[in-house]
């Protein structure tokens, strides 16, 4: 999903997507993962937020809420909140769940709450996007979503369209605001 959203962002010549992931959270107090992943995209650091002009965050859904690694990351952003570093910047959210009733909308809303506290300008996907009318899997007006199922199904055509539309929308808002 992040790659498809990034494709939407990158379609704007004035914007460049910076895709990041987060390490897992462990009850073990010793380091359980390398500081830099051996493969894939780099881990996000709160310092990445200082340079962003717009922010799109995503998380799998667990019991209708964002995953612990994202919550842990967002809980470390108090210095950015105190300085107002993210005020007025556009933001959006996306999620994937394993079941149709996996709480996609509540997961999306849970990710929005810290962004509201940061003073970010939250945007979803408008109903002018055909994918919202055609999908029978994911995509909501609250943000992009994916119904992965138990077998980890690939993104549907409509989910890809919604992801790219969300990226394009945030890129356009970022350009308009800057």
Regions found by a protein language model. Give the residues of each.
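N-terminal beta1-alpha1-beta2 submodule of the flavodoxin-like/Rossmannoid cofactor-binding fold
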Residues: 1-85, 139, 147-178
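Short, glycine-/small-residue-rich phosphate/pyrophosphate-handling segment
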Residues: 87-140
């Amino acid at each position: 999903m992040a790659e498809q959203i990034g494709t939407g962002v990158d379609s704007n010549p004035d914007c460049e997507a910076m895709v990041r992931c987060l390490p897992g959270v462990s009850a073990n107090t010793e380091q359980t993962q390398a500081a830099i992943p051996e493969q894939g995209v780099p881990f996000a650091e709160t310092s990445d937020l200082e340079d962003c002009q717009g922010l799109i965050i995503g998380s799998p859904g667990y019991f209708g809420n964002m995953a612990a690694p994202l919550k842990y990351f967002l809980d470390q952003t108090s210095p950015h909140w105190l300085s107002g570093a993210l005020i007025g910047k556009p933001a959006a959210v996306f999620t994937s769940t394993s079941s149709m009733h996996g709480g996609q909308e509540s997961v999306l809303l849970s990710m929005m709450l810290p962004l509201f506290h940061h003073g970010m300008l939250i945007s979803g996907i408008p109903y002018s996007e055909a994918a919202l009318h055609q999908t029978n899997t994911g995509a909501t007006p609250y943000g992009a979503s994916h119904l992965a199922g138990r077998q980890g199904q690939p993104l549907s055509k409509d989910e890809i369209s919604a992801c790219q539309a969300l990226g394009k929308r945030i890129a356009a808002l970022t350009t308009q605001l800057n």
